[in-house]
Amino acid sequence: MTRLADISDIKSIIPLLMEYRTFYGIKEQNIEEVEQFLHNRITNNESIIFITFDDKTPVGFIQLYPSFSTVSLKRQWHLNDLYVRPEYRRKGYATALMSAAKKYFYDRAKGFTLITEKTNTTAKAFYNANGWKTDEYDFYTFFY
């Protein structure tokens, strides 16, 4: 089952988010900070999260953040996080999360953006198989 997450799902999302952050090299994590981060995103309507389950076990999530297009005068969403526990990969959970997000936003947004590493061939193949296209623009970043 895959569904839109709400405040009651925070405890289920916390371990998934911590595993996801560990994958990206975050070694020291504070569970209270993670919980507060999720709480703020959900209660302040700053992100949309879908969670997927194997029976009653949470196995993955997708989190999207809003932005806007001045040209189209519509909201668009940035797919920032997609995580499925390793033992549940290649079983349709990531596709279910992606499908839920696409369906939810179909009439609510211009579209989606995402960024993945050029060397992440697994993710790139997944996104291509799910209808994503690389664009003709150069994407610049400036981080502190």
Protein language model features and the residues they cover:
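Conserved GNAT acetyl-CoA-binding A-motif
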Residues: 98, 105-116
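Conserved GNAT-fold acetyl-CoA-binding loop/helix
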Residues: 17-39
